Amino acid sequence: MKTDLLASRHIGINEEDTAVMLRKIGVDSLDELINKTIPANIRLKEPLALAKPLTEYEFGKHIADLASKNKLYTTYIGLGWYNTITPAVIQRNVFENPVWYTSYTPYQTEVSQGRLEALMNFQTAVCDLTAMPLANCSLLDEATAAAEAVTMMYALRSRTQQKAGANVVFVDENIFPQTLAVMTTRAIPQGIELRVGKYKEFEPSPEIFACILQYPNSSGNVEDYADFTKKAHEADCKVAVAADILSLALLTPPGEWGADIVFGTTQRLGTPMFYGGPSAGYFATRDEYKRNMPGRIIGWSKDKYGKLCYRMALQTREQHIKREKATSNICTAQALLATMAGFYAVYHGQEGIKTIASRIHSITVFLDKQLKKFGYTQVNAQYFDTLRFELPEHVSAQQIRTIALSKEVNLRYYENGDVGFSIDETTDIAATNVLLSIFAIAAGKDYQKVEDVPEKSNIDKALKRTTPFLTHEVFSNYHTETEMMRYIKRLDRKDISLAQSMISLGSCTMKLNAAAEMLPLSRPEFMSMHPLVPEDQAEGYRELISNLSEDLKVITGFAGVSLQPNSGAAGEYAGLRVIRAYLESIGQGHRNKILIPASAHGTNPASAIQAGFETVTCACDEQGNVDMGDLRAKAEENKEALAALMITYPSTHGIFETEIKEICEIIHACGAQVYMDGANMNAQVGLTNPGFIGADVCHLNLHKTFASPHGGGGPGVGPICVAEHLVPFLPGHSIFGSTQNQVSAAPFGSAGILPITYGYIRMMGTEGLTQATKIAILNANYLAACLKDTYGIVYRGATGFVGHEMILECRKVHEETGISENDIAKRLMDYGYHAPTLSFPVHGTLMIEPTESESLAELDNFVDVMLNIWKEIQEVKNEEADKNDNVLINAPHPEYEIVNDNWEHSYTREKAAYPIESVRENKFWVNVARVDNTLGDRKLLPTRYGTFE
């Protein structure tokens, strides 16, 4: 008998707790609750056919065995992925720290000041290195950033260009191939043509509205693009540049020679390669383009007492507000990796990063000179870290490959027979000597081992950086490990994460990220693998990916899986591109409309637009369900043009709609597909699934249902699962022989995250996963039962129960007292809780999802808190508290306010800070008072250098 299965540690509710909760809900058994919650016609008849669960110890041995199948050769392939050194102080205190990896996107400003500052450091570093005034706080990867640049520049076309139908982007042929593939996927549905050619032969024409360049280019050559950029601007063409962020420590930054957008990846700033991801893409642009910029932007603001603070700025651009009119569908990005990159810049500072870049460049210069002595011809006139060689007549690429592999080295091999390599931060003298030996042996030459490499540069004066960067004091003050550790800790104390308390965000599934699932990520065999190594060197990764894919097929009831999308939004986009490709293959490419319920998350319409579709909104009825009459009418009205329905199940209202099978049948009868948004899959696993219900494709959020962490806004993984007829259209990659529908730079997206979900499924097993779903539903219904008589529950299913989340009614409170759902959210911070989801999907409400991981004690404490806040609301209603000066409208109360000598409120300090006894045991002090949300938008200050003075 196995006694240490993960399920007993992951699920917070035991049998005794269950009995107590069921009595409160008013049902006799857990099965009765589930039977009354989920429609009988969609219940699975058999348990999921998954492997028996492993104990945590057994999984540790299993994952070690898989890791041992990965062969960690020294890899110099480059092409956007490079070995790097993650400072141990960052790995230990950020990457492996649950305070950082279990936090949510920093929408709740007052309990997010730590990671907001960390992300502001990232933005500042990006702006400094690129010499651009504005950067966002990460995108999914470099290739996605390129695609975002294309669509942003398309939106920024002049009126003349729009009238003329300008739709061509010139792309220099020396761009990374994976970047070109992802841009192509994005460009096609937008009607944008990518015209690939030599930048030196570029001739402006009216149909060209933008140009994209790589710096240094894909072969490693550093081109002087200043004249090209001037020529493009004279023709009203914008210029976007994919720039190696580390090279900009030595090279003239694109902002100094006129680039309009600079993008790329910050993987080289201390983030392991992880077999392709995750790492933080970056995106920088001009200030005048800020409202067209994709992704989240951190800016300065002040709290109500004038204290400087940070917040997420210009949110009205984003999909959760603008929906189909959003600048992008980007939602989850790469916050944790951006945080790490920002800390890397803080830890090393300007001189440290210059030293790292100079060392890389010096080794490259040395190898260039030495290999020329062996008879090789180096083709890059100017370079940073990458050399490309034409071989002597008597030497072949295959000879070099054989010798290199015998020394466990991977080089880059070009189609024309050239051989190259990219030097990185980990290249030391021993590695340099191995590289020398490979090329010397192939050429039949003698060579001498070297003891050191002289500091040299081959960069022309015109291309050499002369301007300082990272000049803010934050990049100078924390260069010892002691100071760095304390700085990181000082920031993490400002934030609420799962390490503090339950985060009950509806539609976000903030469940446990178990340590046993997280540990494999720190293994070098998973951290240090380049995504383009030969397949036989990545057998462990490939086996894990294959096993996980099979598990996800079983769980979803589908025939095919792609793990490539780097987020849920990317999954939506990928799934819609698959639908488009399928429809075109059967002569139905004219279908261009997506039907979306009004309750849908904003990413749905934003993704549909990005995938080249038009959206049609379907109404919801008074019970929160899809209005069947309106659905039938809209489906019939758009029958010939309808491509798909996008629907979340259970709905974003937290309800298992009884007509879901009929909904799928109506759509299929129109010749369209059903796209199921898997955001709420945590209420399906083991009990029903999208394939059985009748959907054709769904995406999953591994960072919700499948236990990978949110990381303060990423990394996420959004794999798509599809029915048999859609399998041929899944995203490709050059290593698969086809780049159709490619949506991320790496073949398996953020492969480094996959061991977490793999571990979750392998350790939970069928019974554990199914029980987790049941308990998630139990917990939501328990909270609903506890709070229904005070706040009230907005929507319930046909039999009176909610799904795995519920919407708390706050609109009547506002009508009667002026207290808003936002005031309640801010007051929760004084009790040590992160707010539930505000005003989504119903304005003036709070959506709560407790997940299966919380204990009854935590649920009861949350109920006590909510009921005490209800009492505080009643005090305002009954005029026992001042309507204009009470604990709710003044919340949250930072420590500096509580200890201030000038306490002028009509209530006591104790009522403000310690409203119930449990708060005394685990007090979380907010760092700032309520933040001014308009100030930071009126004057956007996106770097540490900003000032309101």
UniProtKB/Swiss-Prot annotation:
Q: Which GO terms describe its biological process?
A: glycine decarboxylation via glycine cleavage system
Which CDD domains does its entry note? Answer: GDC-P
Its name, as the record gives it, is Glycine dehydrogenase (decarboxylating)
**So what EC number does this one have?**
1.4.4.2
The answer to keyword Oxidoreductase applying to this record is yes
Biological classification of the source: Bacteria, Pseudomonadati, Bacteroidota, Bacteroidia, Bacteroidales
The chain's disulfide connectivity reads: none
Q: What does the record give as the reaction this protein catalyses?
A: N(6)-[(R)-lipoyl]-L-lysyl-[glycine-cleavage complex H protein] + glycine + H(+) = N(6)-[(R)-S(8)-aminomethyldihydrolipoyl]-L-lysyl-[glycine-cleavage complex H protein] + CO2
Record GO terms (molecular function): glycine binding; glycine dehydrogenase (decarboxylating) activity; pyridoxal phosphate binding
**Gene Ontology CC terms:** cytosol; glycine cleavage complex
